Amino acid sequence: MSDTDGKKTLGLRGSRPGNVKQSFSHGRTKNVVVETKRKRVVVPKPGAGKPSAGGSSPAGDPSRRPAGISDAEMERRLNALKAAKARESEEAAQREAEEKARAEERERRRAEQEAKEREQREAEQRAREKAEEEERQRREAEEEAKRAAVRAAAEQEAPKAERSAERAPAAARPEGGDNARRTTDRDREREQRQTRGKGRQDGRRSGKLTLSQVTDGEGGRQKSLAAMKRKQERARQKAMGGAAEREKVIREVQLPEAIVVSELANRMAERVADVVKELMKMGMMVTQNQTIDADTAELIIEEFGHKVVRVSDSDVEDVISDIEDAEEDLKPRPPVITIMGHVDHGKTSLLDAIRDAKVVAGEAGGITQHIGAYQVKTDGGATLSFLDTPGHAAFTSMRSRGAQVTDIVVLVVAADDAVMPQTVEAINHAKAAGVPMIVAINKIDKPEANPTKVRTDLLQHEVVVEAMSGEVQDVEVSAKTGEGLDELLEAIALQAEILELKANPDRPAQGAVIEAQLDVGRGPVATVLIQKGTLRQGDIFVVGEQYGKVRALINDKGERVSEAGPSVPVEVLGLNGTPEAGDVLNVTSTEAQAREIAEYRAQVAKDKRAAAGAATTLEQLMAKAKADENVAELPILVKADVQGSAEAIVQAMEKIGNDEVRVRVLHSGVGAITETDVGLAEASGAPIMGFNVRANASARNTANQKGVEIRYYSVIYDLVDDVKAAASGLLSAEIRENFIGYANIKEVFKVSNVGKVAGCLVTEGVARRSAGVRLLRDNVVIHEGTLKTLKRFKDEVAEVQSGQECGMAFENYDDIRPGDVIEIFEREEVTRTLT
């Protein structure tokens, strides 16, 4: 094959297929066919929805025409309305006909396009089959030619060997005839091998040179075997008309609300440069790292011939969607019992008696300030999971969460105190959650105990106990003496048996966060009650806006466990942040899924906060600023040991205040007080309230240097009372008036350098020089001010008693007449407090 085969002279031409010659080392070259990519024609699918013709509003009742309209005018208007309706219906029919014609035209074009594509595919298939048949015939012909050449060479060598044998000396024939024949056979085999070697073109394709080729002047390397194969492949593809090219794979591309250009190219399996080029054709100058909207990305995907699958950002949570468990997979689980009731009614003491442990001794002031989660095994071998909720008014959200994750509510009511506000709240939480209730009447060992009054008071809140012919079980107990505890456990076991509680332990775990805190040594720690499945060490999970991998599981006894099944409360270590109490924990298959879900939830929460804090109009912003001018604020920072306590404190702070003063929580968090907190408090002039936490050494030093006040509390209502007292100091004092006397004007005198002086008789109380006065004429106040002088017998006096005469002159006022009455009063400031 010559070097000039298939080449033409250079010339100017458009973008058409051509050849490019590439040069390689050792003198090798390669021709590359450059083809122009044909643009894919996207034909819209038939069956597009037709726009509905808008209907005109119905005509009004002719009988109900406005006053002053004549019959002729009314008739003219009706005719005009009918004509308008007729025109509108004609236009609608015309539009429908045009739309129908356009749809038929689109259908015809689509059918033509499909027929054209079908014919093209059939032609390509025929060309492919024809090329394959020709290739097969060519190979057979080449093999047959090789076999014929070998046979011809063998036939030509046989006569030559015979003639050589005949020319040999006759004397040598009888002695070495056999050896001569063997030599001839070896020569024949050597000749055949040489012939076959020549058939391989002397190693041309392998690129090797022999000594004979060098001496004959046949220098230079020839085309390699790989180059020959590539040439044959190109020829075969050319014969098949390019149909052997790999067919394009149509992909379903998932398209979110916004996507990065490089990610879009990756999902389509296309080159990023091609995607950027298409965007530039659409007038968008973007780079591969920029984000484009979903509509633009959809046009790009359709341009490349792929299918669009629209997805939402919230679809990332589909991987943790709840799965219905099969009935055969469900197994019995322990009941979850929440103990609720008013503060100091003995809830923790009752649980203490059941657990036979002194839980209440560790609570500050004997008041539960966290949700305690415990597991108790009864004498009968049954396992019960208890949640002990706080009873203080500030812990409303904690009690609500306790009712939402429980199976049975034990309502503790003190026999000597009856139904109290938090008792009513606990009843409402239990009803809202739809869980059964058991009433435990505690403190029956006290002399003033009255269980009957408790049962009667419960009737006011639609709680009818069995003793009153109702359905709610009630048990009289004493946490102090242990009386009635067995009956209470029997009632709980009976109620749990009625509920038939089951769960599937062989599925990914799902649970609720009862409490969360930031531990100094262990990091973020969450107390989780497992509701479904089994949580194991090493599981990857997402909880609220946080995610993590289970590093350790610790049960209620402080022991490390490897797994936790349904209805088991455990502490989970391994979070990347502190979750909110009440968040749901879900186990995911990969860390990427968990991180994506957590980031999506965090973004949603951020958007909600931004939307809530944004003022919609300038007028609203100005009105809010004007309203805030008259309101005094007490800024504080709150740091607590657990998330639930911080939440309860913030809610309690929101309830403190009135129209004149309010408490503003600048920041609330979990964990020790840090230098960052001190810096924020100094900038805002706010004190730091620490609840069961302390400031570290650097924070204490910084606070002392900057004069920031840090207060520590262990009982929540002590904190609330102190903040309430501090907020009360911002209230303006209340001015009260005390009436101290009355005086009647008998005569009016004019005194030089003084003006008019009233001669008065004090009829009631006392008249003081420093007091305020009002002038009454016919029981109407005509002046209010102060006294310029108060004299008795030409002497200036401080006060005049009842029944005595005196002279009075008003400050900057002279319109006094005989018969007027002077009212004397004093003002005092009274300090106000917040209730």
UniProtKB/Swiss-Prot annotation:
GO molecular-function term, one example from the UniProt record: GTPase activity
Location relative to the cell: Cytoplasm
Binding site for GTP: 341-348, 388-392, 442-445
Gene Ontology cellular component list: cytosol
Region called G3, residue ranges: 388-391
Pfam families with a match to the protein in the record: EF-G_D2 (PF22042), GTP_EFTU (PF00009), IF-2 (PF11987), IF2_assoc (PF08364), IF2_N (PF04760)
Location of the tr-type G domain: 332-500
Annotated region (G1), positions in chain: 341-348
HAMAP family linked: IF_2_B (MF_00100_B)
Name of the molecule in the record: Translation initiation factor IF-2
Organism field: Ruegeria pomeroyi (strain ATCC 700808 / DSM 15171 / DSS-3)
Gene: infB
